[in-house]
Amino acid sequence: GPNDRKLPGNERMISAWPARGGPVVLEDTIYFAAGIWPTDGVYVHALEAATGKPRWVNSETGSMEINQPHGGARAKSGVSSQGYLLANEKQVIVPTGRAVPAAFNRATGKFEFYHLQKNQKRGGSAALLVDQFIGNSGCLFDSASGELSAQIGHGPMVAMPDGIVRASG
């Protein structure tokens, strides 16, 4: 976070911006998110794996005025990491719990998309990347835009060399 503020958490004092979800390592960079409440600030970080030296930080997406999932409401909200981060050649993907994952440019940290209201009742903390898609909550979303591409049904998904396998039952 932006300073050393602490608060009680799990019977001890913790950062007001604790690391959230699971970090992802790709090539020589570690990506992770920190912060719980969008209004207090959420930060997506990229660090050089060997030294811990910051490559970039995105601090702009924790509190954005965006459409909310309840009928025409707009309010300050934003990306809040809830799940294991994903990365590919171009993007860092941040699962956000009850909303479709957010995307950031992997090289610069620039925010690309987050659709809180648009895909109502879709989203989840478990996500996967396969080809040009983000698999999340029984759906495939285009990784370039975050737009819904297909609904494949709920159940565990796994990426295979020839596509996606989904379990049911």
Language model segments and positions:
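Repeat-blade elements of multi-bladed beta-propeller folds
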Residues: 14-44, 70-101, 115, 119-143, ...
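Beta-propeller blade signature
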Residues: 42-53, 101-105, 109
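Hydrophobic, small-residue-rich alpha-helical packing segments that form membrane-like cores
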Residues: 1-3, 9, 21-25, 46, ...
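Short linear interaction motifs
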Residues: 4-9, 73-77
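Beta-propeller fold detector
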Residues: 1-3, 7, 55-63, 68, ...
